[in-house]
């Protein structure tokens, strides 16, 4: 008999604040009591104060059905002009340390000269797609036009493991993601050659090798993409949608289901995502 998995529930936002740090808002949908929410807001506020970060933060909790089950903590803030996010799975609402450590590390990295996040990311559990997973969240986005290195910097700032963007060199939809011996890979829809900067002899190259996928992205329907992700237990799947010709990103969620990121319209915005 297979062990029963804890089911995570996304709660509607109902912000709580700590009197000491009123600009730190905690959204738990009422699942966290007032003292728990205030304790979390105070802990996050102290990290921000210690690092000299102003402007507050938004903390979102995704909690299990059972009172003592796992909790996903997501913290969004801004450091200077850079949007920042830290996300950590914890043992429960009273287990704040993993989220606070990750938040502190994200702030330190954002305040220094950029370099890729350490790889492998041992504190983070690698997600896979269960056989019964369904698409439960759809995120239409305007993709940003960026170089692969700019996309990697945005991915690291937002604490993602994969990031969908429009490649500035080819105009194709593409993803950068964490995998392989170097920790960084690039997949474009059609072109499989390395980015232009890697083919020149400039004295300053990228900080780490970027491995480019040697095969074009598969052309699939959404249903076929879901089937492939389930069959192989993939953490995510980048594919070209058969109907629109645009790159789409199917990704595994902590609740055991899938999210789907789809580009909106035909245009792209300049800059980082």
UniProtKB/Swiss-Prot annotation:
Keyword field: Virulence
Quaternary organization: Interacts with human TLR2. Monomer in solution. In vitro, binds to E.coli ribosomes.
Cited function: Involved in translation regulation. Inhibits protein synthesis and decreases bacterial growth when expressed in E.coli. Can also stimulate macrophages and peripheral blood mononuclear cells (PBMC) to secrete important cytokines that may be significant in granuloma formation and its maintenance. Increases secretion of IFN-gamma, TNF-alpha, IL-1 beta and IL-8 through human Toll-like receptor 2 (TLR2) signaling pathway.
Highest taxon of the lineage: Bacteria
One Gene Ontology biological process: negative regulation of translational elongation
Protein name in UniProt: Dormancy associated translation inhibitor
One annotated GO molecular function: ribosomal small subunit binding
Induction of its expression: A member of the dormancy regulon. Induced in response to reduced oxygen tension (hypoxia), low levels of nitric oxide (NO) and carbon monoxide (CO). It is hoped that this regulon will give insight into the latent, or dormant phase of infection.
InterPro entries assigned to the protein according to its UniProt record, in alphabetical order: HPF/YfiA_ribosome-assoc (IPR050574), Ribosom_S30AE_C (IPR032528), Ribosom_S30AE_C_sf (IPR038416)
A cellular-component GO term for this protein: cytosolic small ribosomal subunit
């Amino acid at each position: 008999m297979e062990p029963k998995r804890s089911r995570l529930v996304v709660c509607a936002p109902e912000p709580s604040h700590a009197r000491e740090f009123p600009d730190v808002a905690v959204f738990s949908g009422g699942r966290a009591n007032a003292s728990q929410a205030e304790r979390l807001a105070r802990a996050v506020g102290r990290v921000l104060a210690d690092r000299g970060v102003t402007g507050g933060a938004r903390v979102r909790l995704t909690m299990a059905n059972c009172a003592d089950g796992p909790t996903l903590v997501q913290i969004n803030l801004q450091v200077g002009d850079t949007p920042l996010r830290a996300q950590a799975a914890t043992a429960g609402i009273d287990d704040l340390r993993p989220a606070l450590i990750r938040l502190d590390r994200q702030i330190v990295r954002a305040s220094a000269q950029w370099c890729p996040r350490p790889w492998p990311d041992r504190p983070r559990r690698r997600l896979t797609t269960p056989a019964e997973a369904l698409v439960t969240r759809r995120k239409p986005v305007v993709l940003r036009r960026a170089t692969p290195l700019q996309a990697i910097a945005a991915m690291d700032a937002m604490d993602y493991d994969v990031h969908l963007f429009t490649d500035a060199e080819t105009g194709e939809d593409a993803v950068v993601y964490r995998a392989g011996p170097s920790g960084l890979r690039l997949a474009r829809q059609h072109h499989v050659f390395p980015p232009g900067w890697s083919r020149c002899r400039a004295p300053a190259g990228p900080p780490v090798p970027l491995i480019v996928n040697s095969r074009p992205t598969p052309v699939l329907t959404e249903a076929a993409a879901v089937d492939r992700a389930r069959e192989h237990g993939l953490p995510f799947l980048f594919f070209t949608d058969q109907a629109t010709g645009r790159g789409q990103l199917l990704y595994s969620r902590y609740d055991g289901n899938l999210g789907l990121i789809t580009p909106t319209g035909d245009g792209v915005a300049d800059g980082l995502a």
